[in-house]
């Protein structure tokens, strides 16, 4: 979706997360990226990010994508900065986070969003996707050559199923590629990011009830 959030909102999130991103250690392997920095706990650290998490258009699509369960919840939040020289990330599915459990084909457990804080280009490491691969089985093997770059301008958002094969691209530019990921999962699954610990309880008074429920302070099923 092009131009879903404003330049003012991008600047706010960049300000709020700058110190956390600078202090984050680069990854230690090819999956996390040795020139890639990640930091999470966006509900607590970035009030601007809460608007992305609660965006009504995104929540509507996520609800439809995960409609085979009674509820869905916030799964993971991160700012990811792919630096110059980063290698391509191995192609994967996000829902492999659940110990590689072989969920039935077509049964999505997560729904993902990638919000562009900078332009996403093929040169700076735009997320690479394999359209239609959410229908494939778990034993498929792919390389970067099988993918296409999800190029988009800053302020846009990429939506995709947790069963879609994808990966971060190689950054051959001189600039960082920075994005916010917000993932949602079925209400009865354990979240990848523990929202109960990442958000101090003394902040609850400042958070709307619908956000608290999305964080997991609600029934996990019916």
Question: Model features per residue range: what roles?
Answer:
Residues 1, 115, 158-160:
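Short hydrophobic-aromatic micro-motifs
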Residues 2-102:
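Non-heme Fe(II)-dependent double-stranded beta-helix
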Residues 15, 38, 45, 75, ...:
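Residues that flank catalytic or metal-binding motifs in active/ligand-binding sites
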Residues 76-79, 113-115, 180-184:
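A structural signal for short, well-ordered beta-strand segments
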Residues 79, 119-120, 163-164:
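Short Ser/Thr-interspersed hydrophobic loop/turn segments at strand-loop and sheet-helix junctions
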Residues 86-151, 189-199:
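Catalytic core of non-heme Fe(II) oxygenases with the double-stranded beta-helix
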Residues 136-159, 163-164, 169-222:
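Conserved double-stranded beta-helix
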């Amino acid at each position: 979706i092009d131009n879903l959030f404003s330049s003012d909102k991008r600047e706010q999130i960049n300000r709020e997360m700058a110190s956390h991103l600078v202090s984050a250690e680069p990854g230690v392997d090819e999956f996390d990226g040795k020139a890639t920095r990640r930091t999470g706990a966006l509900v607590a650290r970035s009030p601007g990010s809460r608007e992305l998490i609660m965006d009504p258009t995104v929540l509507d699509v996520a609800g439809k994508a995960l409609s085979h369960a009674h509820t869905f919840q916030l799964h993971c939040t991160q700012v990811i900065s792919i630096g110059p020289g980063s290698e391509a990330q191995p192609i994967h599915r996000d829902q492999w986070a659940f110990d590689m459990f072989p969920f039935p084909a077509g049964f999505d457990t997560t729904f993902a969003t990638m919000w562009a804080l900078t332009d996403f280009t093929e040169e700076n490491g735009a997320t690479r996707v394999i359209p239609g691969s959410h229908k494939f089985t778990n034993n498929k093997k792919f390389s970067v050559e099988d993918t296409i770059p999800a190029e988009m301008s800053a302020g846009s958002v990429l939506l995709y199923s947790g069963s879609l094969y994808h990966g971060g691209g190689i950054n051959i530019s001189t600039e960082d590629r920075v994005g916010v990921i917000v993932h949602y999962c079925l209400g009865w699954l354990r979240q990848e990011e523990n929202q109960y610990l990442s958000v101090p309880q003394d902040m609850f008074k400042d958070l709307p009830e619908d956000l608290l429920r999305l964080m997991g302070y609600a029934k996990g099923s019916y």
